[in-house]
């Protein structure tokens, strides 16, 4: 059932906005699934990927990477021409799987940057607050992100502190065993 609403949120995203006060929320559903290892968490996203492929929605896996992988970078394709912007995996409308979401819970410099990008990516579509900006030597990258996240992990130590302190949990639907 969760998979259905996850996919439906992406399908209806261009058409649905729910007014709340002076703003709105969109139809995306993002999931943070915490369950013991080797219990089949990844299998659910495999089914989601197949359905998404069949209906024309991109579904990608992500385990780790750089800011450039998430937001994008400038690439020099020809030395005679200026660098060209290459968007990162958070650009556009898609379903995105973090198979080991524990990387988002480890307090290190890299994961903190990743969490900030994901928080921005999950801001309500249509408000302009879901645009990620990265200032680089060759210019500034601005991408609009309309991803739905499917994050899975085992129950890490200190999960209560993360739930209470990290903004990523305010933007996803937590599922636990």
Task: List PLM regions with ranges.
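Phosphate-handling catalytic cores of nucleic-acid transaction enzymes
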Residues: 1-177
């Amino acid at each position: 059932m969760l998979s259905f609403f996850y996919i439906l949120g992406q399908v209806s995203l261009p058409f649905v906005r729910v007014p709340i006060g002076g703003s709105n929320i969109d139809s995306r559903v993002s999931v943070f699934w915490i369950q013991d290892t080797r219990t089949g968490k990844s299998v659910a996203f495999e089914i989601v990927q197949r359905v998404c492929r069949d209906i024309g929605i991109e579904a990608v896996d992500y385990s780790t990477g750089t800011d450039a992988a998430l937001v994008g970078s400038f690439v020099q394709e020809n030395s005679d021409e200026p660098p060209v912007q290459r968007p990162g995996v958070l650009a556009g409308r898609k379903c995105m799987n973090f198979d080991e979401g524990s990387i988002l819970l480890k307090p290190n410099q890299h994961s903190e940057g990743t969490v900030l990008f994901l928080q921005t990516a999950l801001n309500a579509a249509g408000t302009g607050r879901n645009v990620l900006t990265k200032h680089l030597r060759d210019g500034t990258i601005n991408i609009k992100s309309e991803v739905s996240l499917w994050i899975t992990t085992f129950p890490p130590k200190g999960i209560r502190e993360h739930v209470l302190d990290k903004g990523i949990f305010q933007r996803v639907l937590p599922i636990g065993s």
